[in-house]
Amino acid sequence: MTYQENYQKWVDFTGLPDYLRQDLENMDEKTKEDAFYTNLEFGTAGMRGLIGAGTNRINIYVVRQATEGLARLIESKGGNEKERGVAIAYDSRHFSPEFAFESAAVLAKHGIKSYVFESLRPTPELSFAVRHLNCFAGIMITASHNPAPFNGYKVYGEDGGQMPPHDADALTTYIRAIENPFAVEVADVEAKKASGLIEVIGEAVDVEYLKEVKDVNINPTLIEEFGKDMKIVYTPLHGTGEMLARRALAQAGFDSVQVVEAQATADPDFSTVKSPNPENQAAFALAEELGRQVGADVLVATDPDADRVGVEVLQKDGSYLNLSGNQIGAIMAKYILEAHKSAGTLPENAALCKSIVSTDLVTKIAESYGATMFNVLTGFKFIAEKIQEFEEKHNHTYMMGFEESFGYLIKPFVRDKDAIQAVLVVAELAAYYRSRGLTLADGIEEIYKEYGYYAEKTISVTLSGVDGAEQIKAIMAKFRNNAPKEWNTTAITVVEDFKAQTATAADGTVTTLTTPPSDVLKYTLADGSWIAVRPSGTEPKIKFYIAVVGESNEDSQAKIANIEAEINAFVK
């Protein structure tokens, strides 16, 4: 069906709400094509898109269609899955509560139990709720750190991790089989609340989550001595982190936490920031201002659904250093392993997990403590799968998992990135370095001196719409078929094609990769540096990752600059 035919189907539907009809009427031809040329697809983390009318937008009909697919998947299982039900949470975005209760209404029409949070909650708490309530699945309405015009829909499996590939593929099949999203039936929400089929949850689950999060901090004595007076500035960037982060920090003994109050209110427009993304230093503007006023040692920011955390640390000159996701991962891993080693609690079979595009510095740190590093595809569900595997086989003890995109998980009572846990570890880290008369910035430098000057850079290029999708395909094809034989005058030693599941050495030897197929290419160089390229699974972007190791910070930065210039020239 052409985009014009899809558009006309929506125009002809008489039950369309006024706000969506107005959206249709205001579309120019280019917008119309982008909104209707395809269906919003599930990526590494469910589906995410612009809010509005269209098959390639997120709206009540696309949400109903996705949930109808989930309901059919649940019914196909044939056991007690309907009774176990689905936990549903949502963030602070436009239409998030509506999408959550639309999902519950579709499930209820099928006689499927749902537990819906009474108000906004973090993604990690949804993951926890699935496990705590023994649900079959979970739905999180969020677009994570995307700008305000976006929303999204993530599906979780019974282990609390994002739905694994097998079930996700089955779910996609069920969703695609639904030809008319306008025909999806919904139950009356208030009636089903009264009958108990839709159950509203809240504080009781918060309390259980906060009980579990107590175990994240390793050294309570250290916190008692150096954490009480340590000044921390926290901002939830208008999102869900405010629901739990402040309480978790107070419970752990961090009494001098200052919150950026202008960003503590839920605001779907994220009015005080250009983008509510803690990866971007611009999101820290108000936190830096407050930090200077109160003399804060560390600034922490969580994204709207509180699964990612950004960190800035005080430097000797009084300015704040913005840490990369890889630097946060490295300093966390070093501290967790060292603290457990000092306490005599480091297991012999200790294991860490990271994505294939995250820094090798953490691998080197892990190995120095006798721990094993497991590399997985991008998407935290693959780390959740590893945790499940460790539990089933009893072969490794999970210590920490992370992705360079500012996602961390310490304790596996949650099976997705958890910024609340990460905030607690960052606060303890700051207390640890303070106890030594140092800052977190000093800690990063110590790691570089011990393990080498690792540096990384991620370049994200946004290519929207039909043309953008074609450009992304063309760039991937060019890298796959005509990539250079060297980068920065350094020979490529291995090319890993995760789509073909092959690793090809310079001498032509080919080995098979054991990870599931994924559209990622990675080039490892003779000096240990690497370049990776992949399309984003959730946004119209292509991402280039550069990772190097050098003799000094200047050496590493020069290598990155050279490789970045070569990538730009190659892509043109």
Question: Language-model segments: what does each one mean?
Answer:
Residues R292, A296-V298, S319-L321, A339-R534, ...:
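Phosphate-binding and adjacent anionic-ligand microenvironments
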Residues Y156-A187, N326-N349, K354-I365, A419, ...:
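Glycine-rich phosphate-binding loop plus the immediately following alpha-helix
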Residues G85-D91, K231-Y234, M243, L409:
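Short glycine-rich or small-residue beta-strand-to-loop segments that form or flank ligand, phosphate
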Residues A87-F150, Q251, D255-G310:
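N-terminal small/polar loop signature for handling phosphorylated ligands or for N-terminal nucleophile
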Residues F36-N56, A143-N146, P236-L244, A248, ...:
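Conserved phosphate/anionic-ligand binding catalytic regions in large, soluble enzymes, centered on
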Residues F99-L107, F150-G157, D307-I328, V362:
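Short Gly/Thr/Asp-enriched flexible loops that form oxyanion-binding sites at enzyme active sites
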Residues Y3-S103, K193, I198-D229, T514:
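An N-terminal, well-structured beta->alpha segment
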Residues E29-L40, N151-A285, E289:
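Gly/Ser/Thr-enriched, mixed-charge loops and adjacent short helices
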